[in-house]
């Protein structure tokens, strides 16, 4: 590829070639104007050496062998351990807090109050005080000696009986009238077939294997924190602001987060545990480690909220949706926000549509974002509603989707998935009368829209080429296990035309260029173009050195396939790098704004299908196979992209069948805050999983990639619930679909 | 932290002497005890590690009378795979051992430890809850609280369920257990290991302080004997049963000549159901017969607010166990 910077309009081809087994490429021409100095765009015609291939996870061996050091693993001589005293009271006021006895306990080095007398206590687990000491036994002993007293108030941890909760009948359906709307009433009256049903989902916790927390070490007024986080820069600012009294500014704080054991949306902030850690280390004048235990992780670090959702709608004689009325109520913890629910909008383009949501406060830990916030809940309700409506109208669910889905990409995906999954045959297969095992298949769409954080030039990537031929690509953003290091390595190696083994990616140290938080599937679309730009700039510098060495004009020197030079005058990569000298080529790439022209598609599309087998005697549901097709723009590292999709499907099985927070209403305390009673899908519960990555040249920046945290998380539970509906010929409208609910659905069907 | 002494005995006599001291707990694999001690739910003054006695207390052997001797410290993996147990009459034992927890746990957990498990009730197992069985309060909190995993049968003032999945098949097979206490060996029917009245104040077992279970004995099974163990769960990987059933039948000339039926995970004790078993005797196996036995097995059930599903599921598990045993 020519190393000259394009400054004029470039014509590119966007879209995708026909999916296997389908006819007709969906390619369009676009004219884009890259920013001055940016790398020229990749498009649908680009021939890649590495991008899109099956490379291994670059840190897979380090993780599997234990060499990778997570915050939990960090240790220093003289390091203290710490714990937090938690409120046993769900609602009230702190009326007394005496720390002196705890501070005098043997082995205790620091005690800090996290609330003052008179402060409100908002939920069981609210942080009251923290202790650091020589080991966890000494710390626990001291915690038990803290005298905290509370003025307890009446509490409620059930959002369905909150003051502003809707009326619900004995079957769990919302019985309150819909708010008046003449247009909606008319649309429903005109519809040929209508349906009205209530859906419900329970609270799912993030359950990251590495809990929240970290290690803090002060050197004078400089603070270093090894933190398990999804937002290194956000946490750096958060801690600097919170610690202003300690005479520090943002520049004094360094966050290290090279390996993170999962976050799923729960680790955007340093939180009270992060602050406590730094205060304790400051007071004790020693490094302090504070990692939450599993109960604290379940009960104080957020969750995917529960929701009660109701849909009514209707179709015309042609099976087109003409009315879509939706209302939902989310459990929102004490913060009374964050419980919202999203529903698909691409089925109802011509329908009369209404959507309402209300968050209901309870005296519990508030929600935090979790893989596609609001989406798995809403898609479950909406897609199951659509299947029920389709069944009433006598239409096959796939035909119903094809009739109503307005997105071309998904039209192709529906047909492709149906072919691969064997939809028609599986759907037509009837269960033998009286059979104990009931089989069924179901499907769901997915959508998530994010093309990165454009217009944030502060996001960047450092690229260095050393004289020994090795290459560094560095970001200060974190990687909570999703494959960012591999993505950066592949982009860099592709741009430089070198072996992937020569590239080392490092992430998670705030001394390196800033990047986004790992949220909303923004990291890949934000950093892939920056990594490419950095490699592109580094390549230009290397080309200049080689040009000078060979005595040829720099503008025409190429760097590809491990060779740098012009025409027949080529240096091997290793030879070329020897020209660099002791100081490496050291450049910083930036994240330019997205192109002004319209991208091929503004969001990511997916479809999933599931098959279940239900024991009608015991109500036990087994998912036997799942198939997903997922678009993420340009596929950079195929195996890792597939891993993100399959992982989301596994999480979806768990959400559909197993996971739920169970609260004791009297005490306001979670009963199953461990990994024994909080049930997460394990290997023997997993179906055969398969996915197809649908690579699309999107044309929104020089790379055209999208992230995969959210998109594949949307559809799984909905597809499983629809398969259960098919198998039972009766819907289970409440997740998780545990045996008791299946038996109830069968009994009600009669 | 309350300090405790840790005894590593050289032989059974030394273990028994240590076990007789006050405020002492015995540790097998420690699968659960270590967790409870870390959570300070149990804070003994002394812990006696029995694992050094594996040489004398582990292993499976056929005795001269055709019975099977199972050492108390035999692991679940050994039980599942042992050559002496590859017999249709003992299928229930292998099935039960093989579906417990995870391979890691089965490689470590012992037979006696499984039978002597502490309840998994979420009220009992959190010091935040002042419940009677946990020794922290006046009443059972689960009776009126969240009880989807709790008892439906045989409960008095505490609705915990007995979590052992080896106890039902051992009871169905007519097993006995041997203990040592103050130098004396005693051998009794396994049913005597569980309290006759499983009240909140009673522990899960009837062992006296210092008493150590040394072996289980499964008597020689008659010709035509077959057994099966089934349990319902909410997931297949590492879960506790919501209901369980072990059955042993003796088939003669196409009819059931003798039967035993024991339920698990539905009451504070593993529950033999003699009336259900008696209904099978003299009959030819059939779906209708199994349905009848299942109904009898759950006769007199008293479900709580959130666990009546256990009746439907439990009856299905009884039918399935009978089907597997007579197939």
PLM region spans:
Chain A
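Flexible, low-hydrophobicity surface segments
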Residues: 1-174, 273, 588
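Glycine-rich loop/linker segments at domain edges
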Residues: 53, 58-65, 175-214, 306-384, ...
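C-terminal catalytic domains of large/alpha subunits in multi-subunit enzymes
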Residues: 2-22, 104-105, 245-252, 282-290, ...
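FAD-binding core of FAD-dependent oxidoreductases
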Residues: 161-162, 254-273, 299-300, 332, ...
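Catalytic phosphate/nucleotide-handling subdomain of diverse soluble enzymes
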Residues: 458-512
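Thiamine diphosphate
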Residues: 259, 263-285, 289-292, 484-491
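Short acidic, glycine/serine/threonine-rich loops at helix termini
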Residues: 142-145, 236-238, 264-270, 299-305, ...
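Helix-loop-helix junctions that connect adjacent transmembrane helices in secondary transporters/permeases
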Residues: 166-244, 398, 402-470, 490, ...
């Amino acid at each position: 590829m020519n190393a000259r910077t394009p400054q004029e309009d470039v014509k590119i081809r966007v879209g995708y070639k026909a999916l296997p087994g389908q006819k007709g490429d969906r390619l369009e021409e676009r004219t884009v104007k890259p920013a001055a100095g940016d790398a020229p765009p990749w498009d649908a015609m680009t021939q890649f050496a590495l991008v899109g291939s099956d490379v291994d996870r670059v840190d897979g061996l380090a993780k599997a062998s234990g060499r990778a050091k997570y915050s939990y693993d960090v240790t220093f001589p003289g390091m203290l351990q710490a714990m937090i005293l938690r409120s046993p009271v769900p609602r009230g006021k702190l009326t007394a807090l005496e720390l002196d006895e705890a501070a005098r306990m043997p082995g205790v080095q620091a005690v800090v109050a996290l609330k003052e007398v008179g402060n409100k206590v908002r939920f069981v687990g609210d942080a009251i005080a923290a202790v650091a000491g020589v080991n966890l036994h000494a710390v626990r002993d001291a915690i038990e000696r803290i005298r905290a007293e509370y003025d307890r108030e009446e509490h409620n941890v059930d959002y369905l009986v909150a003051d502003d909760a809707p009326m619900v009948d004995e079957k769990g359906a919302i019985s309150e009238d819909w708010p008046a709307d003449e247009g909606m009433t008319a649309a429903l009256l005109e519809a040929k077939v209508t349906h009205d049903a209530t859906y419900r989902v329970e609270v799912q916790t993030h359950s990251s294997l590495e809990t929240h927390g970290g290690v803090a070490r002060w050197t004078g007024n400089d603070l270093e924190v090894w933190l398990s986080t999804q937002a290194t820069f956000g946490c750096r600012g958060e801690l600097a602001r919170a610690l202003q009294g300690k005479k520090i500014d943002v520049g004094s704080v360094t966050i290290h987060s090279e390996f993170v054991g999962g976050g799923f949306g729960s680790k955007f902030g340093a939180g009270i545990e992060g602050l406590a850690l730094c205060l304790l280390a400051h007071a004790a004048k020693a490094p302090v480690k504070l990692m939450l235990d599993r109960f604290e992780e379940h009960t104080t670090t957020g969750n995917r909220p529960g929701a009660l959702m109701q849909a009514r709608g209707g179709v015309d004689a042609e099976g087109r949706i003409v009315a879509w009325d939706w209302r939902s109520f989310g459990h929102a913890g004490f913060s009374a926000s964050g419980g919202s629910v999203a529903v698909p909008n691409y089925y109802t383009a011509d329908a009369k549509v209404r959507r309402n949501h209300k968050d209901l406060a309870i005296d519990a830990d508030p929600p935090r974002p979790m893989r596609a916030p609001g989406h798995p809940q809403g898609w479950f309700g909406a897609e199951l509603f659509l299947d029920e409506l389709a069944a009433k109208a006598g239409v096959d669910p796939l035909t119903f989707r094809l009739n109503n889905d307005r997105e071309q990409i998904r039209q192709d995906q529906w047909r492709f998935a149906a072919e691969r999954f064997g939809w028609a045959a599986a759907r037509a297969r009837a269960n033998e009368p009286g059979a104990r095992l009931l089989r069924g298949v179901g499907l769901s769409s997915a959508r998530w829209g994010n093309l990165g954080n454009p217009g944030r030039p502060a996001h960047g990537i450092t690229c260095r080429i050393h004289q020994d031929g090795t290459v560094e690509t560095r970001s200060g953003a974190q990687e909570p296990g999703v494959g960012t290091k591999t993505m950066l390595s592949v982009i860099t190696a592709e741009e430089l035309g070198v072996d992937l083994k020569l590239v080392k990616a490092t992430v998670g140290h705030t001394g390196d260029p800033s990047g986004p938080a790992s949220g909303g599937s923004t990291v890949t679309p934000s950093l892939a173009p920056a990594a490419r730009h950095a490699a592109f700039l580094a390549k230009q510098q290397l080309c200049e050195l080689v040009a000078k060495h060979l005595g040829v004009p720099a503008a025409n020197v190429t760097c590809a396939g491990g060779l740098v030079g012009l025409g027949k005058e080529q240096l091997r990569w290793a030879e070329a790098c020897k020209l660099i000298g002791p100081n490496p080529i050291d450049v910083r790439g930036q994240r330019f704004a997205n192109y002004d022209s319209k991208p091929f598609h503004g969001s990511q599309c997916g479809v999933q299908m599931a098959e279940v087998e239900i024991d009608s005697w015991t109500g036990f549901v087994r998912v036997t196979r799942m198939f997903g097709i997922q678009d993420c723009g340009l596929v950079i590292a195929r195996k890792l992209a597939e891993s993100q999709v399959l992982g989301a499907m596994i999480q979806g099985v768990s959400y559909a069948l197993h996971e739920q927070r169970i609260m004791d209403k009297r005490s306001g305390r979670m009963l199953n805050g461990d990994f024994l009673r909080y049930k997460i899908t394990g290997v023997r519960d997993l179906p055969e999983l398969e996915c197809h990555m649908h690579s699309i040249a999107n044309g929104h920046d020089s790379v055209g990639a999208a992230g995969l945290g959210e998109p594949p998380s949307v559809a799984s539970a909905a597809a499983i619930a629809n398969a259960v509906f098919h198998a039972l010929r009766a819907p289970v409208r409440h997740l998780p679909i545990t045996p008791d609910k299946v038996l109830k659905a069968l009994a009600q069907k009669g | 932290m309350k300090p405790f002494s840790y005894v590593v005995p050289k032989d059974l006599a030394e273990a028994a002497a240590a076990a007789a001291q006050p405020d002492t707990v015995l540790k097998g694999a420690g699968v659960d005890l270590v967790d409870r001690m870390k959570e300070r739910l149990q804070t003994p003054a002394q812990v006696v590690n029995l694992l050094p006695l594996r040489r004398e207390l582990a292993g499976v052997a056929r005795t001269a009378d055709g019975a099977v001797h199972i050492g108390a410290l035999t692991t679940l993996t050994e039980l599942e795979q042992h050559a002496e147990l590859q017999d249709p009459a003992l299928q229930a034992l292998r099935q039960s051992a093989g579906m417990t927890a995870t391979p890691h746990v089965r490689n470590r957990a012992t037979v006696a430890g499984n039978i002597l498990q502490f309840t998994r009730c979420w009220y009992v197992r959190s010091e935040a809850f002042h419940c009677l069985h946990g020794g922290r309060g006046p009443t059972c909190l689960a009776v009126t609280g969240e009880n989807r995993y709790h008892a439906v049968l045989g409960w008095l003032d505490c609705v915990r369920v007995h979590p052992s999945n080896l106890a039902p098949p051992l009871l169905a097979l007519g097993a006995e257990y041997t203990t040592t206490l103050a130098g004396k060996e005693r051998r009794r029917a396994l049913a005597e290991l569980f309290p006759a009245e499983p009240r909140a104040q009673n522990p899960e077992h009837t062992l006296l302080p210092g008493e150590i279970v040394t072996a289980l004995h499964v008597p020689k099974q008659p010709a035509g004997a077959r057994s099966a163990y089934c349990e319902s769960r909410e997931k297949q990987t590492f879960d506790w049963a919501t209901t369980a059933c072990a059955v042993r039948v003796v088939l003669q000339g196409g009819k059931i000549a003798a039967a035993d039926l024991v339920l698990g995970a539905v009451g504070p004790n593993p529950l033999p159901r003699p009336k259900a078993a008696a209904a099978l005797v003299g009959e030819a196996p059939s779906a209708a017969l199994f349905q009848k036995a299942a109904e009898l097995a759950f006769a007199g059930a008293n479900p709580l607010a959130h666990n009546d599903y256990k009746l439907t599921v439990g009856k299905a598990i009884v039918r399935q166990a009978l089907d597997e045993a007579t197939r």
